Amino acid sequence: EPQDEFITFAPFFPEYRCFVESTGAKLVVVPAQTEDFQIDFAAFEELLTPHTKAVIMNSPNNPSGAVYSEATIRKLAEILREKEKEYGHAIFIISDEPYREIAYEGYEVPYVSKYYDDTLVCYSYSKSFSLPGERIGYIVVPDEIADFERVYGAIAGAGRVLTHVNAPSLWQLALARCAGRPSDIAAYEKNGQLLYQGLIDAGFTCVK
């Protein structure tokens, strides 16, 4: 619907705006909480309206690298459950997780769907297996989600319409043999540490 709103959190992957606005909906952006890049819940709650249909979140985040904590996700889920009751309709979380494995120093990346039933999980192998541009991944639609049949049908329909992003059959076969194998992120971690230390040495302040 023209008045539908999707909320996301700054900083965010720029194409989110294209995805949302191409449907005629509006992207609403919660300003960044720069001291730790967790969610500014006061700002978030001010932006929620009866037109809010979904929240797009990305953890580990592109471009900040921040990982939303379990406490952050629990609070987000609690607020959205209250708003679902108040507004009388589902508010989905679209959890975009292409960087799930790329977390360092023992950081745990919580599974959002563990805390909130109305969660769609979008995963891509482009980062974990270094396959950018190959358009191979999946969307998890839990049985518990509101309007399951309608949501599942809409996603399946989108895959048929957007033929330029359909998963190539060759990569589907290849990934079936690779799924579940650990990703070697040592090079990413080393490069990240070098960049971080370089910025600190140059006088910058960085959140880590």
What are the residue ranges of the model-derived segments?
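Conserved PLP-anchoring active-site segment centered on the Schiff-base-forming lysine
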Residues: 1-19
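Active-site phosphate-binding strand-loop segment of PLP-dependent enzymes
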Residues: 34-107
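Short, intrinsically disordered, charge-balanced linker/junction segments flanking boundaries
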Residues: 1-3, 49-50, 194-208
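Conserved core segment of the aminotransferase class I/II
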Residues: 117-189, 193-204
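Short beta->alpha connector loops at strand-helix junctions that form conserved
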Residues: 10, 29-34
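A short helix-loop-beta submotif of the ANL/AMP-binding
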Residues: 21-27
